[in-house]
């Protein structure tokens, strides 16, 4: 697994290769304002991505949402409700109502998958653990091994993300 400083450099390099020009980076002031608005701290690696790579516009498939700014942002998309737990920040819209989100209250910053399309009566059943940490999730993108990669999805032994074990308790709080 890559060290945090190494992974940020690898993400920036890949983002520049794929996207060319990237959006502006986020300032300390903008991060502080986002924290205040959200009401919880952001994982250090996530902050570094927004400050050292770009304010969104990079990453797997549909690209990370900007943290702040005009239009759709992670901060604007966040809002605890009956199906969205406090402290879980959406970072990528997969389409069809699905999101990748980071559990900002867990020190490991796991990346969760919100997949509501089965129409669960129990919203906890719409939450899955995509990756045990943001670092591992980014590595799966960098290495081409994420579930969203066509080769991985089409494989007979394609992995299914496990249910998020904290979903029920976190949705109740």
Locate the predicted segments by residue:
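A surface-exposed partner-binding patch
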Residues: 1-99, 162, 166-173
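Long, low-complexity, intrinsically disordered segments enriched in glycines and aromatic residues
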Residues: 53-162
